[in-house]
Amino acid sequence: MEQEHISLNKFISDTGLCSRREADKLIEAGRVMINETTARKGNRVGLADRVFLDGKELKGQVKPIYIALNKPIGVVCTTDQREPDNIIDYLNYSERIFPIGRLDKMSQGLILLTNDGDIVNKILRAGNYHEKEYVVTVDKSIDTSFLKTMAAGVPILDTVTRPCKVTKVDQFTFKIVLTQGLNRQIRRMCEFLDYQVKALTRVRIMDLNIDGIPYGEWRYLTESEVLWLMEMVKDSRK
């Protein structure tokens, strides 16, 4: 996942501590660290980085933002604005945010965006087993063998996918609940079994679902949803 970075002296200045020029002097004096490394003039930091001055962590004066988007087909989940149809240009949000994870260009559905680097790491860390649910339509009839094999695990990308919940919706459609996020995982799993995905929609991330968000639109998470999300990830590893 790509993240937008800013200059370290701007980050320090934005805390209200001092000017950028004064921040550079602090950096040159060896008093600033990024994570566990002594900073150097010209360094840049992302939202997941931690910055320390004389051993004390500096916190940017930024209000946390949490957005749920019903991503339309064709939008690319990257912060790289050189990429056509990137999600940042699509939202055209006034402040710096980035997506939590990805949905590939031809998929649609729920994706969260934020400026909170800590929560991004906790949700995305593979060992945290957070559920994501999808509704998938394929090109031919779904049989019992397909459902059982998908649920048990499929060899892709030099590994075997984790066991997961798979339920049939109709002749060509199924629901699947994953606790990992390999690249194009569902499409690769289906291709291994000689099925082609015709439509893929993410409908849920943990207990946050897409209900009430029209296709292509977004809303802020409610205060109760944010509190719930914090509770869900409080024991997650960063």
What is the meaning of each model-derived region?
Residues 1-238:
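Basic, flexible Lys/Arg- and Gly-enriched helix-loop patches that mediate nucleic-acid binding at interfaces
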